[in-house]
Design a protein with these regions (language model features):
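Charged (often Lys/Glu-rich) extended helix/loop segments that serve as interaction or gating elements
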Residues: 2, 251-403
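Active-site-proximal loop/turn and secondary-structure-junction residues that shape catalytic pockets
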Residues: 45-47, 68, 89-91, 108-110, ...
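Structured core elements
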Residues: 61, 84, 105, 129-131, ...
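Solvent-exposed alpha-helices and their adjacent loops that cap or buttress functional pockets
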Residues: 77-78, 96-98, 120-123, 140, ...
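Active-site loop/helix belt of alpha/beta enzymes
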Residues: 135-275, 384-386
């Protein structure tokens, strides 16, 4: 364990610590895998401003899911041509806020019409991207109904709409499923999305300037249970697409990083505040369990509902039972089995059940790994009005950023 990290945890728990050097190494891995592609960081995975600034400085753009994420990306140093605002149900106010700050990806025919109306009010003509709901599914099969994107079969309607609006389409976005670890499944989705881009270009008679392949790059949370994505094999798909692009459109090719840069760069630290025994069961009570990191409590809830079975992933709320390894920083000369619970006024506030590890005492620390993505940002922190955990970005040279 890095002694500097441990010292920061002692001083700041409950807290999230994000390690810059791990983030940088993850980004370098993606750059080596996809040298001809631009990388877009999914801001929703971890919008902590120092993290976004660091990734912007490493050259990443943004997949922004709201107008505030667009504005955060700009504030953190990203160029507006590197920010792609793609979300269902954008309000007119959201479109206005993001209008001059990033690229807009329309999610529906209705949104295209509203963008056209805004263009007319502003006396402008605008190029946009469109998110597509393709006729294919992830891993094969046919497409399904979805709240996201414009159905591929609705391209004739989109063409008719565009013909009457001061709006042109210059790119597409496809996102079917995140946290996939099968290179053939994800690579096949990229291949099919490239073919879809050609169909969209032909149907709309437009210039295709960019293709965002979406769907993120999956993370193996625990090597004992999951095999990491075979990035070398995935590259065979992306290299083939890039070669075809070089011979034809020379469009901008983009891959969403998803949680890959940050998930394994973060740890969550809790402090033990009490310990008790109740009718044969030992409880360790720590500050800010469910209201600091919610996903383990959701995993316990699903496990109980299934009667002990293994729940299927339901991203981003539930990834797997082994997604967040727990390390007890206690007395290693003694072992105990306990339930680690929080200080909220509800029984669902659980970090781990029947956890066996070093004996913990009041004041000891508990570490939760893989807490750099869909962790702090996904947690309901205001329940019971406790102080929320701190967040810190930690550099290898000892520097720390908190805001």
């Amino acid at each position: 364990m890095n002694e500097h990290i441990l010292t920061l945890a002692r001083e700041n728990a409950p807290c999230y610590l994000y390690e810059y050097d791990i983030m940088k190494a993850q980004v370098e891995t993606l750059r080596q895998t996809f040298p001809q592609y631009d990388l877009l960081y999914s801001i929703k995975a971890n919008p902590f401003p120092p993290v976004v600034r660091a990734l912007a400085a490493l050259g990443l753009g943004a997949d922004a899911a709201s107008a505030p994420e667009v504005l955060l990306s700009r504030k953190c140093g990203m160029a507006k041509e590197d920010i792609f605002f793609s979300a269902a149900g954008k309000s007119d106010a959201a479109l206005e806020a993001a209008w001059d700050e990033g690229e807009i990806i329309a999610d529906s025919l209705g949104e295209v019409a509203r963008i056209g109306a805004l263009c007319r009010r502003k006396g402008q003509r605008r190029a946009i991207g469109v998110r597509m709901n393709p006729a294919f599914g992830m891993g094969g099969g046919v497409g399904t109904s979805s709240k996201f994107g414009i159905n591929e079969e609705d391209l004739p309607q989109l063409k008719a709409l565009l013909d009457d609006l001061p709006v042109t389409v210059e790119g597409i976005h496809v996102h079917l499923k995140s946290q996939n670890l099968d290179a053939d499944v994800l690579g096949g989705c990229y291949r099919d999305s490239w073919a879809l881009a050609k169909r969209v270009q032909a149907a709309l008679d437009c210039e295709m300037r960019y293709v965002n392949f979406g769907s993120g790059v999956g993370v193996a949370y625990d090597a004992a249970f999951e095999q990491p994505m075979n990035l070398a094999h995935l590259r065979t798909y992306t290299d083939a697409i890039a070669a075809d692009n070089d011979a034809t459109w020379k469009a901008r090719l983009m891959i969403e990083t998803g949680r890959f840069p940050t998930a394994q760069a973060g740890t969550y630290w809790l402090r033990v505040v009490d310990k008790k025994f109740s009718r044969g069961k030992a409880y360790v009570i720590a500050e800010n369990c469910m209201n600091g990191l919610q996903k383990p409590a959701l995993a316990a809830m699903l496990r109980h509902e299934l009667g002990g079975g293994t729940p299927a992933p339901y991203e981003p709320l539930f990834t797997s039972e082994w997604a967040f390894p727990i390390i007890a920083h206690g007395d290693e000369s003694r072992t105990e089995t306990v339930d680690i619970v929080g200080n909220l006024c509800c029984a669902a506030d659980v970090l781990a059940e029947d956890f066996t590890g070093p004996e913990l005492a009041v004041g000891d620390l508990i570490e939760v790994r893989n807490a750099g993505a869909y962790a702090c940002t996904l947690t309901a922190q205001r329940f019971s009005s406790h102080q929320p955990p701190r967040e810190l970005l930690v550099y290898g040279d000892g520097r720390v950023e908190t805001e």
